């Protein structure tokens, strides 16, 4: 039986990394099926209650959705208009994905109150793809590689023998470790500060530290709503402080009005094999994560977690996870995944009705259609975002360690971890080790996530030790 981690009391509750923890965790506190529900899966709450529940879910996911495009745009040094559009499309695509997941269109979707949003797990490989060939290469790789997750949904029981909790934990840890350098770079002021010589200035580092400390303070509050909103509060106060220091200029927002038109392939599409392979590995992991998230959601919603109904629900949810990521690529956005923090929100509100998901989807789509929304967040100074993401990325790595720790660490597991972390971190710390390889191989293995993840899969399959 899958269990619901008690990490809700820590940073993992709100951050997107929380979804990484519900994969196949063992030895955590269990949750009684459907305990404390006011409205079940197919109930229709009154409109006012539905809207209120939807807004609470929206609060828990909004920052998580807009942060990946902001980080990717910053790393690729994209202009303000492009960054704003990517943020808007992330909201729009998340709305479409959430509707499909909740509604279940044919075999696609789980039919639960399951919220999807832009995934943190893909940031590293996406940045690598963007540096290789720009946005067209990113979206091409996202679309093609998503077929891996859709295929896994059809052969799920076999895949779980390859992507074990140990392998998942290693990959999740590497994802967090590889992203920490992105977060600390933002704390110093990002690419703009590096270009103008102000990187590491006291105002940048101090602003990032302020946001970080505020998040910690509010996260430790005994008030559950303050705890859930800790990242939002930290970012808002940091943003206001940056404005007071003259670090924000809102004049650009005034020149953008009207609506965003979600034009497919606005930035073109191209294909790079190394980028596709790098993203495909992450899709393998997110498929297994989606299985855990759907199981936990079913349990909390009082639905079966075994039998034919559950198998169809899990397969449909994973299929939707891949399909929605492909759809996001069509609409100039990045891969989506299920947000497990919303499972905690179901417990808090007692509302498991999937009809709430329709309202959440509608809110996200509407927000994505207004350019000013994306632009306001695009103007957020990098140190403000860096203070929050540094903590988020650290929790991703910590979540991976917890997944590993839930398993028996025998001689084989020790060897698998040693090889995976050694190879994965080596190419991150000393990228020149690959300088003599052909371009295609160098691009594939330059990502620590890809190198370490493939090493973990192969080592776990091939190493045999008699205890």
Predicted regions and their residues:
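Intrinsically disordered, low-complexity non-transmembrane regions of multi-pass membrane transporters
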Residues: 14, 19-53, 252-263, 299-316, ...
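N-terminal signal-anchor module of multipass membrane proteins
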Residues: 26-113, 121-129
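Membrane-embedded helical hairpins/re-entrant loop segments and their flanking transmembrane helices
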Residues: 47, 73-92, 96-109, 281-354
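Hydrophobic, membrane-embedded alpha-helices of multi-pass small-molecule transporters
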Residues: 48-60, 65, 200-212, 229-230, ...
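Hydrophobic alpha-helical transmembrane segments of multi-pass small-molecule transporters/permeases
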Residues: 50, 54-58, 142, 166, ...
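Short, non-helical or kinked segments that cap or interrupt transmembrane helices
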Residues: 85, 107-120, 161-170, 227-232, ...
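Membrane-embedded alpha-helical modules
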Residues: 129-252, 359-467
